[in-house]
């Protein structure tokens, strides 16, 4: 059985269906506080974003922290990438790009920081895909992984309104305890795995939903935001993300 839950055609269709991809990545981009904390305490100069097309985090780390960044993906739409870089006052010389298969590619160099944001949940064998990250990582380097949490309210939204997208995700991977165990089994140190963010919901196909559905989801989003202002707790039920961090 193939390890991948998606293929090249899926991602080609996915990115070609998107509009407004070329925006200026803000200093407040998702996970910015975590990156600030990490970079304040570690001498990180190089980073590679795996499965990250169109490279928003590689751009973020280059633009705001001056890191030497690389984007690795098995599908890179060059016109989109060029537009995204230009929107951030960068050129194709500023972010190195490697188009390749993570299961076949032999890294030519290693990096101080290896990150992926929304990659590992698209594979059946979670431990194996985490292990694939490590070949890119310098000894003493930091592994930083994020993935969506579809085991709570946001998962219900996905199952109810976009089952096709839900099925492209390995829901069993969305378990911080299990993710920490995998990292420890792979020999990583200082392992942290936890739910992140108080609350959010989204749909990839929101534009295709009815007005009634859009209205309901807007109310559900607002209700969750109000609740988590009163009870600001990160949890399986409400947090939109899971974060994993470890040292090689």
Where are these regions (language model features)?
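Conserved N-terminal segment of class I S-adenosyl-L-methionine
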Residues: 1-109, 113, 117, 130, ...
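A short His-aromatic
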Residues: 118-122
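Generic detector of intrinsically disordered, low-complexity, polar/charged segments
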Residues: 48-52, 97, 115, 138, ...
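Short conserved AdoMet
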Residues: 62, 66, 124, 138
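S-adenosyl-L-methionine-dependent methyltransferase catalytic module, highlighting the catalytic core
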Residues: 3-8, 13-29, 88, 102-103, ...
